[in-house]
C-alpha cells in the first residue's frame, strides 16, 4: 500500500524540481511575419530554374513508346548517361545517395516502376511444360 505513495511523492518532487508543471504565463512569441533585429538570417525566395519548361519525369506515352521500341532498363540508363553510376551504386552507398538526387535517376526509377507494372500485367500460361 505504501509503494504507490512513494512513487507519487517521488514524481511530484521531480516535477517541481524540473519546472515541468504548467505555467499560466504565456511566452512572448513574435509572429513569423514580423521582422526584428534579432533575426540574423534573411529568408530569400528560392531562385527558379533557368528552364522552367523542362520536364523532369517521363510521361506515360513516352514510357509506352520506349517499352514498345524494346528499350530495356539498361538501354535507358545508357541513354540517360547514368549506366556506370547505377553499377557503382550497387556497391557504394555514397554513389547511390548522389545518384538518387539527380533528375536522371528520377526518370530511371519512373521507367523501372513502369516496366515492373508491365511485367505484372503479363499473365502466366495456363499450363506448364516439364
Swiss-Prot record:
- Looking at the record, which segments are called Disordered? 27-58
As annotated in the record, motif RxLR-dEER runs over 38-56
Recorded GO cellular component terms are:
extracellular region; host cell cytoplasm; host cell nucleus
Q: Which residues form the signal peptide?
A: 1-20
**Domain of life where this protein originates:** Eukaryota
Q: Name one Pfam family in it.
A: WYL_3
Q: Which compartments is it annotated to reside in?
A: Secreted; Host nucleus; Host cytoplasm
Supply the InterPro entries for this chain.
PexRD2_WYL (IPR040691)
Q: Which UniProt keywords apply?
A: Host cytoplasm, Host nucleus, Secreted, Signal, Virulence
What triggers or suppresses the expression of this protein?
A: Expression is induced during host plant infection.
Family per UniProt?
Belongs to the RxLR effector family.
* Domains as described in the record: The RxLR-dEER motif acts to carry the protein into the host cell cytoplasm through binding to cell surface phosphatidylinositol-3-phosphate.
User: What this chain does, per the record?
Assistant: Effector that enhances P.infestans colonization of Nicotiana benthamiana leaves.
Name the record gives this protein: RxLR effector protein PITG_14783
Q: Which organism is it from?
A: Phytophthora infestans (strain T30-4)
What does the organism's lineage look like at the top? Eukaryota, Sar, Stramenopiles, Oomycota, Peronosporales
